[in-house]
Amino acid sequence: MLRAEKISFSVGKKQILKNVSASFLPGEFNMILGPNGSGKSSFLKIFSGEINRFQGTVLYDNKKIKELRKEELAKKRAVMSQQADLGFPLLVEEVVMMGRYPHFTFNPNKKDVTICNEVIERMNLVEFKERNYVTLSGGEKQRVQFARVLAQVWEKPADGYRYLFLDEPLNSLDISYQHEFLQAAVELIKDHTVLIAVMHDINLAAHYADNLFFLKEGEMTVHGRPKDILTENIIEKVFNVKTKVIENPVTGKPLVIYN
């Protein structure tokens, strides 16, 4: 389990997060949504250890994140940020291998190579394997970056859980790859995985998420199962937009229609 207890965070005089608490269970797809500037990405960065100056407590398996060594943290959690660009040319297979860096000292072993090949195949990137990363489109880069973070936590942990943090992972992806991406994530959480993604598309979130967490102005407004919290009143309160929420005739899940 991953827990946040009374998290507050400020940049200068601006308070980004205000006394936010939440729990995230393994085996469930957790998605954070909210308007721009609501603190979603900052919340994710605190969980991943990228931001370490904050008030409150983050617990990995009941162990404080500030007590985890960087090497230990790197082996159990992976982060996919919004920025997919690299400042130097690498082959796609080399970028994916970057996800294995925490697991070896000098050179990758046979297991590292096997894992990268499995991930590349799973993400349908075999034809891109020897392409220069900088020549790829934005959507192709996103897929490679997802393969990289999957490679980092591909192995099932001997004890405890693995953690995957995705910050707006669907940027630049077309519809088919959005679903491929989310389906791969759903498969991953079945094996001792805590998964948290920052999302913008409410209907995709309603389709794939087990739990939704709504942030607004740095505060946790509401959280729960999509069918319980995706109501017209809550959506208007969080996003200041009028909607009609109906049952998807195919999936039975909430479907948000904008007025």
Where are these regions (language model features)?
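H-loop (His-switch) and adjacent beta-strand-loop-beta switch element
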Residues: 212-226
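The feature captures the beta-strand-to-loop junction immediately N-terminal to the Walker
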Residues: 33-35
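ABC ATPase nucleotide-binding domains
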Residues: 232, 237-259
